[in-house]
Each structure stands twice: as C-alpha cells, then as structure tokens.
Amino acid sequence: MSINPIDIDNYPAILQDKAQEVASIFKDLALPAPTIFPSQAVHYRLRAEFRLWHDNAEAYYAMFDPAEPKTPVRIDKFPTASKAIDDLMPLLLSKINSQTVLSKRLFQVEFLSTLSGDMLVSLIYHRLLDEEWEAVARTLASELNIQIIGRSKKQKLVLDRDYVVENLPVDGETFIYKQYEGGFTQPNGALNATMISWAKEQVKEKLDRDLLELYCGNGNFTIPLSKQFRKVLATEISKTSVKAAHENFALNKVSNIEVLRMSSEELTSALNKERSFRRLEHVDLDSYNIATVLVDPPRAGLDHNT
C-alpha cells in the first residue's frame, strides 16, 4: 500500500474550508473576521517521524492509515517535510539498509530540522545499543553532516548533542533557539515567524506593563515579546522546555523573564491567593502589572478557573 500524492494545487481551497470550519465553531462569540496566513504547500514541516518496516532484507519508512492500522503505508518521499528532511530520507535509508548494525531491530526514525540548516535524527531500537553501533553511527553522522541519537528501552546515546539550533528571522531580527529532542517546537518554521510577528504587532509596546504567558515552551514567543514589556511572567510544565527556555534567554540576552514550572491551575490559585507554593518563594506576584495574557494551551485546553 502506498500513500496518495499531495494535491498542491488544491491547498488554497483546503485552507479556505478550514478557515470556514474554525469560524463556524466561534460564530456565537461575535469575534472579528480571522486574518488568514497561508503556509507553503510543501516542504513546510520541520519535524517528522516514521516507523521503519522490515520486509525480508529491506527496510523502508512507513506510516499507518487509522482505517487500516495494521497495514504499513510505504513512504519513499515526504514532501510535507522540510526539503532537508525529504532529501535526507533516502540517503539515510540507504545507509541503514547497507549495514546490519544500523538496521537490526530499528523500528522508528525521527527527524528534527531547522530553517537554518541544523538536523537531528533519532534512531529508536528494540535492542540494547553497544560500542559497535556507536562507532558506525558516528561515521554515519559525519558522512551525512547530521546529529544522531540512539535510543532503546532505558537507554539514550547522544553522539554529540541532543538538540538543534534554530536562527529564526522575525521583522529584521534573528532569534536563537535551542530545540531539544522530545521537546515541543512549532513544526512550521516559516509560519512560526509569521505568528510571532503578528503577536508583536498586536501588543505594540507596553514598557510600563507586564506580560503573562501560560505554557511558554522553549520561549518561542516569550523572547521576542519580552522586548515590548517591562517584565514577563511565564509558566511551563515540561522540564525539557523549561531548561531550553532558560538557555534561550541567555542566548538572546534577555533578562526580564521569570519562568515558573507550574500549571495554569496552580498559577491561578497563587494569583488568587488561594494557595502558596515553594516554587514561588522568590517571586513577588504582586509586583507584576499584567497588561496582556498570551496562551497557546495544551491539547487538553485550560481549566475553567484560568
């Protein structure tokens, strides 16, 4: 079974249908008409992951149709992914198929790329990885000029680093982000820059007021917006994202951001003085004069009180 080709020419119609669907959900709220920013139709996604399906002596990338979850869909090209990922896929697969130490019990391959050309590949196995695998993987990383991580149950081998570095251009500035394997990043890099630019335009400058951001991730919006506020108070629950955020603040030389590792429910409780937290012992919540709240919530949404 193979995947159907992407209909690039139909993208504008698909986008319009999606916009109308979303608008209909919020029709009772009397919101202004949405502003629509089209994406590239191909090569827009900076992350991709595939099962590696073994068929006799050959392995290939595979995905699964929810309607037929036991039947692998062979993926030879994936134009949805960034061109760097799409170009790398056959080169990497050829290397994997040519060396048993790489292909043996390999069941998943994950790609993380950036607009600025960095690439991280995670190879995930159903076996313990040894020194032989590490030596071959180091050669592979050098030949393909990529970062490689090997994973198996309770094992993670980082050959060099477990992150990529993005240099994101927004409104004439360049923002630097470490993006860690396993951490959330915006998958559409070009549209991410557009979203940040749009957010900056909406808030204007409020240098005498403060920003509250819920679920800030690695500082994707936090860093560009911090220049337009006196202070920023941000929350995040992922350890990986909090670590990346602190490192990204340093890389971008911003010092007016306080990140709290807590949920929106907990922060709301603290702001309402319903509960105290040791994590807030060093933070004077009363010193914040919040003018704007930014939230990109998790899929579960926000709690009612927040």
Q: Where are the regions that the model predicts?
A:
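Secondary-structure transition/turn motif
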Residues: 64-68, 123-127, 180-181
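Short acidic/polar mixed-charge low-complexity motifs
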Residues: 57, 69-71, 117, 171-175, ...
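A short interface-forming secondary-structure element
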Residues: 78, 121-131
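Extended interfacial segments that mediate partner engagement and assembly in macromolecular machines
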Residues: 2-106, 115
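Nucleotide donor/acceptor-binding cores
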Residues: 46, 119, 209
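Short hydrophobic/aromatic beta-strand micro-patches
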Residues: 51-53, 112, 122-126
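Rossmann-like S-adenosyl-L-methionine
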Residues: 128-306
